[in-house]
From Swiss-Prot:
S-adenosyl-L-methionine binds at residues 76, 81, 127-128, 141. Its main location: cytoplasm. Keywords: Cytoplasm, Methyltransferase, rRNA processing, S-adenosyl-L-methionine, Transferase. HAMAP family: 16SrRNA_methyltr_G. The keyword Nucleotide-binding does not apply. Specifically methylates the N7 position of guanine in position 527 of 16S rRNA. This is Ribosomal RNA small subunit methyltransferase G.
């Protein structure tokens, strides 16, 4: 199966409706990851098929959880997941990609330019030191324990906003260690076509 068909089949299996032009741009993003990986150490994956599953389809599981959002912050964005795939598919959402690694933010800037993502801003720095970002949704993928995630980013969350933390196995221990002023709205298991591993998303809000 060629890569375009593999991506299309995965998107269909997830019940998502993504324009053909956006799918082409997602594959262009994979090309950029492959091109710059040796220089910037963006991903341990080298196989394109695995990149499509782990970096595209896995990131796209976020889309139903940012419905209605106008602004999103992707913390510890690294090589741009889930922020860049989300930005490609949701051009109506203003997305900030934040990472403390300057090599990775240099790549993110390049990717934003080459992919023509007018709705994306890249910020380099530690999240605790950032003050000029406010978001309806703050997301991360394998960034930090939930308690640290909400503690470090709470000042950047808009009133009425929420966190959407992408996790592997059900994070019961992390949930138990959350501060009293944060409540768990839901933890949903995610099905990623072609990925033989558990995935969950935790939706959290301030009390």
């Amino acid at each position: 199966m060629e890569r375009k068909e593999r991506l299309r089949a995965g998107i269909a299996a997830m019940g998502l409706d993504i324009l053909e032009t956006a799918q082409d741009r997602l594959l262009a993003y994979v090309d950029l990851l492959k091109k710059w990986n040796k220089t910037y150490n963006l991903t341990a994956l080298r196989d394109e098929e695995k990149m499509i599953v782990h970096h595209l389809l896995d990131s796209l599981t976020l889309l139903p959880y940012i419905e209605g959002a106008q602004t999103m912050l992707d913390v510890g964005s690294g090589g741009g997941q889930p922020g860049i795939p989300a930005a490609v598919c949701r051009p109506d959402v203003q997305i900030t990609l934040l990472d403390a690694n300057t090599k990775k933010t240099a790549f993110l800037q390049q990717a934003v330019i080459e992919l023509g993502l007018d709705n994306v801003r890249v910020v380099s720095g530690r999240v605790e030191a950032v003050s000029d970002v406010r978001a309806d949704v703050i997301t991360s993928r394998a960034f930090a324990e939930l308690a640290d995630f909400v503690s470090w980013t709470g000042h950047l969350l808009k009133d009425g906003g929420y966190w959407a933390a992408m996790k592997g196995v059900y994070p019961q221990g992390e949930i138990d260690r959350l501060p009293q002023d944060v409540c768990v709205e839901k933890v949903q298991r995610l099905d990623v076509p072609g990925l033989d591993a558990e995935r969950h998303i935790a939706i959290l809000r301030k009390r």
